Amino acid sequence: MKLIIVSGLSGSGKSVALNALEDAGYYCVDNLHLGLLSAFVRQLMAPRMPLYELAAVGVDVRSGLEELDHFDDIMAEIRAQGVEAQILFLRADEDILLRRFSETRRKHPLARKGMPLVEALRLERSLLARIAVRADLTLDTTRTNVHQLTHLIRDRVEQAGGDALSLLFQSFGFKHGSPVDSDFVFDVRCLPNPYWEPRLRSLTGRDPDVGAYLDEHAVVQEMFDSLRDFLERWIPCFEAEHRSYMTVSLGCTGGQHRSVYLAERLAAHFRQTRGLNVSTRHRELS
């Protein structure tokens, strides 16, 4: 049986994630106390013909400090039962979480009389750090809406259904902030910028004219070759450690031209040469 533990900060999209997993065929339970998790798994595996081969459980801070402190032991017990267990952790910037709570008027699970929302968020972040550091996949939803998050989770989880690494190439613009849900971040702002060509300014790195412009510069090919060789060298090492997910982020100034172009080229290369499960996400084009 495959089990995904869905955790993260309140307001970061855990319910959206569980809904997406349910649509993908997972049996989902939200807000399960950590102390009940092992028994829950045993029940799912008890029948001679198990009813559920895919399950997902939402776990939040309400499990309490004692159970959170024993998270590693709980996960070890589950894996000892032969379960393929993965951890999905969602986060978002504090100002975005505050805005979401203001818009939805939902109450934070740690909110107590006299405790400001910002303090509840910071306490939650501290308590859930025990889970966050063990996450197989971390998604930053700061700049992601409900529909984008749904598609992103479906893509990553379905791709990780086999033994192959699920590899995401993500473009972004540094002026909008660096993504924190990355395994590698590469700065490509040193490359020639199509933005300064009036005919290319409104286009993106997906457009042939932008690609042709960048292909004219030898330094762009050199950058691609260097990134390709680096990833070819080190991806097998991550696979050897049984990693299910990897996110490679490439950033230029605005996230429209150079980073998009390189993300697409690298994704095409690794799809063709290694047969990996590869997807792309262009944060600023969303």
Curated annotation (Swiss-Prot):
SUPFAM superfamilies found in the cross-reference section: P-loop containing nucleoside triphosphate hydrolases
Keywords, sorted A to Z: ATP-binding, GTP-binding, Nucleotide-binding
Disulfide bonds: none
Family to which the UniProt record says this protein belongs: Belongs to the RapZ-like family.
UniProt cross-references to HAMAP family, sorted A to Z: RapZ_like
Reported function: Displays ATPase and GTPase activities.
Name recorded for this polypeptide: Nucleotide-binding protein Tgr7_0722
Organism placement in taxonomy: Bacteria, Pseudomonadati, Pseudomonadota, Gammaproteobacteria, Chromatiales
